UniProtKB/Swiss-Prot annotation:
Cellular component annotations (GO), alphabetically ordered: cytoplasm
Protein name: Meiotically up-regulated gene 129 protein
Keywords carried by this UniProt record: Meiosis
GO biological process terms on file: meiotic cell cycle
Function: Has a role in meiosis.
Biological source species: Schizosaccharomyces pombe (strain 972 / ATCC 24843) (Fission yeast)
UniProt superkingdom: Eukaryota
Amino acid sequence: MLWRILTCCKSPEEDKDEHKKKPPNVGHAHLSVVSPLNELASEKSRSSLCIEWTIDSLRQFVQQLSVRQNMSKDRREALTYFINSYNDLFHDVYYGDGRSMSKTEEAQTIVTFTIGSYLYKYTHPSELFWQRLSDNMANIEDDGTCTEAQLAFRKRAALSKLGHPAFHFLPMNNKESFHYAWSLFTSTYFQKAATVSPSPNQQPVDSVANPQLRKASEITTISSRSDVDILLGKFKALIQESPDEHCNSWIQRIYITCVLPRNHYIYLLNEQVDFLTSIEIMKNQVTEGKLCLLNEDLGTLN
């Protein structure tokens, strides 16, 4: 099925090699299929980041966004309201203790995140995407680190249509992959590396006939305080159902992704070729170090 589509990209030889020499922690991003080459697994990437998390990252992104965009007064106030609401929702603030990731792990995160972005972009209507995400959550969280209660919580979050869609594809208990995807996504966004406009012949996923129905079902852009109020209501209901501290920290990470644009991608799939072929090309470019973002020091978001 689409949710495990990447497993189709492996050759029999790759499967044999993976069983023989599987690098530590490679199972964290279980959807991805980047070949676990020994030299990549052991080599630490210069782009790995260690940053204090959630509220600090959220403030940094919104600050840069306000500097670079000509925001309306209503949107500035809405984003400030969204930031301030974080402390009202979450009393035990989450901080990440970031660890350096191998290039293989980073490549896995990139491929997995790109798959999530691609599926959201081309699933119409978007309600179908979220339903499929919930129905197939067990195939995403299939590395054995997610309990049944945590899995059920993730399904409810998907059905609530909360946060950036692609971040739901990353394993809940692998904080490093989430940190890395956020850092890479926000850095490339401000570099204008992969922001695209919908095709003239393609209805944007975020478009529905009635804007009020969109607001009631899925907030894709925070533009007013009413947008924030809708999000807060959904998050409050979900937090009350949280089964443990792991879900508490995960939902905080999902919360901050609500500010991220959904028409931006850390990697663009080649839409002129077959879907599987496009993924294979991307996988090879990442593992061979041809993707320039893996060879640059992203620095901080300051």
